């Protein structure tokens, strides 16, 4: 393990050479740019869906009382489904998790732990995951809230884990700390299926959505 990463918290590890790092937002923007090459594709941002109904076609009611008609509808709201479909909402639990980004940690401090620019994720039920980005900044994620209430100090909450795993790095102030929702299911398997012949859904990736949502999207398409 020492040739890749070193920490007093971990005694052994498995190295997977088939995996890599990804910037989630850039990946999302890249997908959007590819979709927009198709002139029949339209992306609506900041457009809340109020309701929908299905007969021969699907009618989607969005904000400002605007209706959109479509042959098919795929519901992929995940943890943010709200009251759009209460049956689907009951199949998932929105759970909050947290990430901190550090831009002020000197390279010599990071070199104490990172031998190579790898991504690390542990096997805890509420796992810790962290990596160095392309600018050698530390991105550290972990923690969970099942109550939908954030800790009073998000950064301090994450630093408790950093102190155990990367001792000494917790003294540096985070550039930014944020929270977001993931949707978990009881059995931790994604919840995918159809409601009618022309309405489909996919949700509940239990923290693995970035890896498999593109595959699920192709399946539904």
Regions found by a protein language model. Give the residues of each.
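Dinucleotide-binding Rossmann-like beta1-alpha1 core, especially the glycine-rich loop
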Residues: 1
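Helical element adjacent to the flavin cofactor pocket in flavoenzyme catalytic cores
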Residues: 12-71
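Substrate-binding strand-loop-helix patch
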Residues: 22-23, 209-212
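Hydrophobic alpha-helical bundle architecture
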Residues: 201-208
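Internal hydrophobic alpha-helix adjacent to the cofactor/substrate pocket in enzyme cavities
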Residues: 161, 214-221
């Amino acid at each position: 393990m020492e040739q890749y990463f070193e920490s007093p918290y971990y005694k052994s590890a498995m190295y997977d050479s088939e995996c890599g790092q990804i910037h989630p937002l850039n990946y999302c923007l890249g997908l959007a740019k590819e979709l927009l090459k198709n002139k029949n594709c339209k992306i609506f941002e900041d457009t809340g869906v109020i309701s929908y109904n299905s007969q021969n076609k699907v009618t989607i009611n969005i904000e400002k009382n605007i209706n959109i008609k479509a042959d098919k509808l795929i519901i992929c709201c995940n943890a943010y489904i709200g009251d759009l479909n209460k049956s689907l909402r009951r199949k998932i639990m929105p759970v909050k998790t947290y990430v901190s980004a550090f831009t002020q940690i000197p390279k010599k401090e990071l070199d104490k732990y990172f031998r190579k620019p790898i991504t690390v994720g542990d096997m805890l039920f509420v796992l810790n995951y962290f990596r160095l980005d392309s600018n050698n900044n530390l991105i550290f994620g972990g923690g969970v809230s099942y109550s939908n209430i954030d800790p009073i100090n998000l950064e301090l909450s994450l630093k408790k884990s950093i102190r155990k795993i990367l001792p000494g790095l917790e003294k540096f102030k985070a550039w930014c700390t944020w929270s977001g929702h993931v949707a978990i299911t009881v059995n931790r398997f994604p919840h995918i299926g159809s409601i009618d012949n022309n309405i489909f859904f996919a949700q509940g990736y239990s923290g693995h959505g970035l890896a498999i949502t593109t595959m699920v999207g192709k399946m539904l398409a």
